A protein has these predicted regions:
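Short alpha-helical basic/polar micro-motif
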Residues: 4, 93, 122
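Flexible, glycine-rich terminal cap/loop adjacent to redox cofactors
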Residues: 100, 117-120
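Short cysteine/histidine-rich metal-coordination sites, predominantly Zn2+-binding motifs
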Residues: 109-117, 127-136
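N-terminal pre-ligand scaffold of iron-sulfur
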Residues: 8, 12, 18, 25-96, ...
Length: 164
């Protein structure tokens, strides 16, 4: 092998090694982000004995999780309906139409979205308005008298419930 050929080979090998050294951590980060995206952690919402039975209550709580290498902490809210001390329905506070936060109208016994007048029954079904689907429920569990919620975000404006 001549000197010029050897130098071309050496430079090519160094370029490949450099590409691997720089590329593998980058690809690992991308794969790690894709693998952990959308996985919510269980967040403590509060004691169930402080929640009234059969009446929707909006509760704010701190949720946290890790996405890729970043730890995040968010202030979230949910609507909770306690059916018994061991059974609850938890709704995302976001209207399924365009993402506005809805409220509970105690006088009429229904959830109402102030943005485009979507109205939902106590069980989350659409009574009228442009909302394409019922209210989104969140996974919930009760352990030792404490309610935990797996907070998720959903795509709005579509007939199917899709976690984003």
């Amino acid at each position: 092998m001549q000197r010029r050929g050897f130098l071309k080979w050496l430079v090519s090998c160094l370029a490949v090694i450099n590409g691997l050294i720089l590329g593998i951590p980058f690809i690992g980060t991308l794969l790690s982000s894709a693998a952990t995206r959308g996985k919510a952690a269980w967040s403590r919402v509060g004691a169930v004995d402080r929640l009234p039975l059969g009446v929707p209550v909006e509760v704010r709580f701190q949720s946290s999780g890790t996405e890729a290498y970043f730890h995040r902490s968010d202030l979230n809210s949910v609507w909770i309906i306690m059916h018994s001390r061991g059974d609850a329905t938890v709704f995302s506070p976001v209207c399924t139409h365009l993402g506005c936060h809805f409220t509970w109208n105690q006088q009429h016994g229904r959830f109402e979205c102030p943005c485009h007048a979507s109205v939902f029954a106590l069980d989350g079904t659409v009574l009228y308005g442009p909302a394409p689907r019922r209210l989104d429920t969140l996974p919930a569990k009760i352990e030792k008298g404490v309610l935990y919620v797996e907070y998720e975000r959903f795509q709005v404006g579509t007939p199917e419930k899709k976690v984003i």
